[in-house]
């Protein structure tokens, strides 16, 4: 059994971003999935990039501009975002609030390509 508050995990700055932190919530013994909590402070961003693996995301708090492929969204609390493998995407917390979301991925090898 495993139950911990998501605010109690170690947060690390995400390289090549502005005002973005990540915390891995999944216990290390899980060999199938990884759940991460990502926080973009107001004015923060993650630049345009692709990943070899898909992402499934659930917005916990705030509002942000999210671009997936050619589509731009104003993502907000309660939204679910699916990002297929290999599709470019970026995030910008530009609506006067921090933006927090869960990002679920598999444990397959990933490769990030900055665009």
Cite the ranges covered by each PLM segment:
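Ligand-binding loop in jelly-roll beta-barrel domains
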Residues: 29, 85-111
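Short, conserved beta-strand element in jelly-roll/cupin
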Residues: 39-41, 51-66, 104
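A short, N-terminal "cap"/entry segment at the start of jelly-roll beta-barrel domains
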Residues: 1-32, 114-115
């Amino acid at each position: 059994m495993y139950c911990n508050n998501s605010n109690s995990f170690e947060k690390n700055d995400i390289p090549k971003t502005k005002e973005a932190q990540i915390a891995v919530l999944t216990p290390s013994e899980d060999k199938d999935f990884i759940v991460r909590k990502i926080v973009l402070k107001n004015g923060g961003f993650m630049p345009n990039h692709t990943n070899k693996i898909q992402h499934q995301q659930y917005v916990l708090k705030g509002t942000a501009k999210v671009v997936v492929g050619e589509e731009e969204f104003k993502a907000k609390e309660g939204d679910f975002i699916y990002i297929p493998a290999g599709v470019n995407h970026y995030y910008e917390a530009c609506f006067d609030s921090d933006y927090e979301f869960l990002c679920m991925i598999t444990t397959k090898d990933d490769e990030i390509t900055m665009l």
